[in-house]
UniProtKB/Swiss-Prot annotation:
GO molecular function, one term: ATP binding
Organism: Methanocaldococcus jannaschii (strain ATCC 43067 / DSM 2661 / JAL-1 / JCM 10045 / NBRC 100440)
Family: Belongs to the archaeal ATPase family.
Pfam families for this protein: ATPase_2, MJ1010-like_2nd
InterPro entries according to UniProt: AAA+_ATPase, Archaeal_ATPase_domain, ATPase_dom, MJ1010-like_2nd, P-loop_NTPase, WH-like_DNA-bd_sf
Name listed for the protein in its UniProt record: Uncharacterized ATP-binding protein MJ1006
Keywords: ATP-binding, Nucleotide-binding
Length: 359
């Protein structure tokens, strides 16, 4: 129930705030993409809180009005580490049909894979799981509709294994990729879209030879400055306030928080200074308490961003700081744009916090 309530809250947030965030480019790309013939797995990636899920949910909201599209949407962010049992509970709904409306989200028309009431989850094999998924997808196609499978934070399934029937345990995630290639590249049956902010996971996928020529990547990055300017002007911020904010804002939630704080009587300078102080203290705590690296080496990695917000991966490799940078990526201080070979802070305000750390 908590999972469904969380999704409902995000939909409500979407309806209220999406008008603020000009994501027409990303929205149109994804709306057009899901209406093409399936031919590859699409990985939608970007910094944490850049709006990936919000854009994807808007795509579902707008296109689910069409009778020829069926969206299977699964959000794994509610779980720190889902178990095998939780995976089955999230992905399947017991009932008398091969695909069923999510009963908690009927208005949005999100579906789940259907499975018969008597099916025994306790003794299910991985091949059985995939057979049931394919049955659901084929049922959608038989009804003259196009299935679209969307998984938010897919990497959370990394730790789940199924018994391999005498051949050792099988990684759910690895086997899912094989299934996704079959559904997209081989049979062109179903779109598969995976959303993630874990760019080390994206790097693994990108380097995985078995997924070569079977995957595409789409970046949903920071908001564009012109979009931020238009939003703030619409909300009644003065030109001076807007110019100040443009130096520091980059993510959608920052805008809504700034708007709320202004209504509560806080100036934009107060709000932004608080943000930077909090981010600075988080970074200092992280690098001073971890035991894996020398603190000086982590500071050296951060110093690469002293005078620029983006650093080419080649510079990091040349300075022999890749392990330290990966640690900072894992802890959401830095973001790795794998497709473009660029490392940058996860947000602009994080960059200013980094600059204070290395002063």
């Amino acid at each position: 129930m908590a999972i469904q309530n969380g999704l409902r809250n995000r939909i409500l947030f979407l309806v209220i705030f999406m008008k603020f965030y000009n994501r027409e480019k990303e929205l149109n790309y994804l709306k057009n993409y899901v209406q093409l013939e399936p031919n590859s797995i699409l990985f939608v990636y970007g910094p944490k809180s850049s709006g990936k899920s919000t854009v994807m949910l808007r795509v579902i909201e707008e296109l689910s009005k069409k009778d020829d599209l069926v969206f299977f949407y699964y959000d794994l962010r509610e779980y720190a580490t889902p178990t095998k049992e939780e995976f089955l509970e999230i992905f399947f709904e017991k009932g008398d049909k091969k695909y069923l409306l999510n009963r908690f989200e009927i208005n949005l028309k999100i579906f789940k894979f259907g499975i018969e009431e008597k099916f025994d989850f306790d003794n299910i094999k991985l091949n059985d799981v995939f057979s049931k998924m394919k049955e659901s997808i084929n049922a959608v196609i038989k009804d003259g509709k196009k299935p679209i499978l969307i998984i938010d934070e897919l990497q959370k399934l990394k730790s789940i294994y199924f018994n391999g029937e005498g051949k050792g345990d099988k990684s759910l995630l690895n086997e899912l990729f094989n299934l996704f290639v079959h559904l997209t590249k081989v049979r062109h049956l179903c779109h598969v879209i995976c959303l993630t902010s874990d760019t080390l996971f994206i790097e693994e996928i990108y380097r995985n030879s078995t997924l070569e020529n079977t995957s595409e990547y789409y970046l949903i990055d920071w908001l564009r400055k012109e979009s931020i300017r238009n939003i703030l002007k619409e909300e009644g911020f003065s030109e001076e306030e807007v110019d100040y904010c443009l130096k520091y804002l980059s993510l959608p939630y920052e805008i809504s928080q700034l708007i709320n704080n202004k209504k509560l009587g806080l100036s934009v300078e107060q709000t932004i200074k608080q943000w930077i102080n909090i981010e600075r203290d988080k970074i200092l705590y992280l690098i001073s308490t971890q035991k894996e690296f020398e603190m000086g080496k982590l500071i050296d990695a951060l110093k690469l961003f002293e005078n620029k917000i983006k650093v080419d991966i080649k510079e990091i490799i040349r300075d022999n700081l890749m392990d330290e940078v990966k640690f900072l990526i894992k802890n959401e201080i830095l973001f790795y744009d794998v497709m473009n070979g660029i490392i940058k802070p996860t947000s602009v305000k994080k960059w200013y916090a980094i600059k204070e750390v290395i002063e």
